[in-house]
Amino acid sequence: MLQPKRTKYRKQFKGRIKGVAKGGSDLAFGEFGLKSQEPNRVNAREIEAARRAITRYMKRAGRVWIRVFPDVPVTAKPTEVRMGKGKGSVEYWACKVKPGRMMFEIDGVSEEIAREALRLGAAKLSVKTRFVQRIAE
């Protein structure tokens, strides 16, 4: 699963996801993509599950680009532990996704295969997404 090799600080504030994606909202590598429609935190397990679903359906043909990286540590306290006594330990890594952010891109397959592969991948994610295609010039 994806996670940073090292970070400046071990833990982070929860924060809020405001506004729309400034960068990373257009197709940069592939012919087809999966774009987020709502703000949410997507964890590393979801990203990996989506990647597996996409590559499995494509039968190793074509190429997949993951355009998001889980760089936010999410902490949790153990069950049945009283409040206080400091912040919990890092449970998993997540990525803050804004609306309009390109999450996955694929190339080297037909539109039907791309559409179905990204639909299967989207089912694994906790954000609403839509299929996008590069406009032929």
Swiss-Prot record:
Molecular-function annotations in GO: rRNA binding; structural constituent of ribosome; tRNA binding
Q: Which SUPFAM superfamilies match?
A: Ribosomal protein L16p/L10e
One GO CC annotation: cytosolic large ribosomal subunit
Q: Which InterPro entries match?
A: Ribosomal_uL16, Ribosomal_uL16_bact-type, Ribosomal_uL16_CS, Ribosomal_uL16_dom, Ribosomal_uL16_sf
Keywords noted in UniProt: Ribonucleoprotein, Ribosomal protein, RNA-binding, rRNA-binding, tRNA-binding
BP GO annotations: translation
| Record-stated family | Belongs to the universal ribosomal protein uL16 family.
Q: What does this protein do?
A: Binds 23S rRNA and is also seen to make contacts with the A and possibly P site tRNAs.
How is this protein organized at the quaternary level? Part of the 50S ribosomal subunit.
Protein name as annotated: Large ribosomal subunit protein uL16
| Species assigned in the record | Rhizobium rhizogenes (strain K84 / ATCC BAA-868) (Agrobacterium radiobacter)
What is the organism lineage in this UniProt record?
Answer: Bacteria, Pseudomonadati, Pseudomonadota, Alphaproteobacteria, Hyphomicrobiales
Q: Please name the gene that encodes this protein.
A: rplP
